[in-house]
Amino acid sequence: MKETKTTDNPFALPKNPSMKRRAKFNDYHDRRMYMITMVTEGRRKLFGEVIGDPNIEIGKPNSPHIELTECGKMVEKCWREITLHEPAVSAGYIQLMPDHFHGILFVRKDMKKHLGDVLRSFKIGCNKGFRSLGSLFGSLSYYDKALDKALNKALDKALNKELDRKHGLLFERGYNDKILYGEGQLARWENYLRDNPRRLLVKRMNPDLFRVRRGINVAGMRLDALGNLFLLSRPEINQVQVSRKATEEQLAQYKSFFMEAAQRGAVAVSPGISKGEKAILRMLYDMKSPVIVLLQNGFGQFAKPGGAFFDACADGRLLLLAPWEYDSEHEKITRQQCLLLNEIARRIALRNG
């Protein structure tokens, strides 16, 4: 499983790495709900330190949480005050992490301003607060834990220099937004945000399982990987491939086969494209059985597994493989890509068959 470069990957899609592009179909003046993400300039850990026991339920003593610095408290305060400056916008739940934050914004009615203008004003307020805190760094001992020598040097430089078009003061230029569409999505967002501190602690405990490896040689192919690479060495790996036309009876037979295989320690591999394949993968997740999943898109710069993938990855039960580089505008998988993913799954299964 040697790591190699993927520049000549025959499956490669055009590079399109930006996570900060706006949705072309969305009017950012309209009534809408968003989850906003902003990252500190240089990924500096300015907002606090995540502490606690990842095995303790959220909300109980010593459960995972972030202990905010004064800088983190200032950003949280600015977020809460967005409504004071733009009455059409309500600031919802915010989860600060050491070097970024996620926050929910509700545009309650159509507004003249673009959402980007509202967030630009928020950043200006944060920058003012950051400058004020900067003058106190020399006398506040509790900043010693949160701000390293590189920060002090970078801050001094930033405070005495005009910002260029590529860099910000406190935050990176731009922001990422996700638009709420379906019923129940808001609750899922809030649960995800509250779970962020626990997820970070789990990643710290299992760093190798959450690191993207580029150009891994898998059955003669170069793939990017995240998760437990040792699953590729299991003696039995079975491909999950179910036709879209499969009957309920046929699906039940497939489930029975993969359930028995999982009970004897077999690994399943699949891109999980059809409804039947998804149903079998869900069954295997519930059984806490090992699974190799082929992704329809590649890994971004800060890729991490989400949802059910996260805990499966932490437990060493999951390996994610991607034959293509990340494409931020990836929308719908093509028939050719489906065929390629199933062929890759077939080769992985045959390799261990």
Regions found by a protein language model. Name each.
Residues M1-I216:
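Short catalytic/metal-binding and nucleic-acid-binding patches
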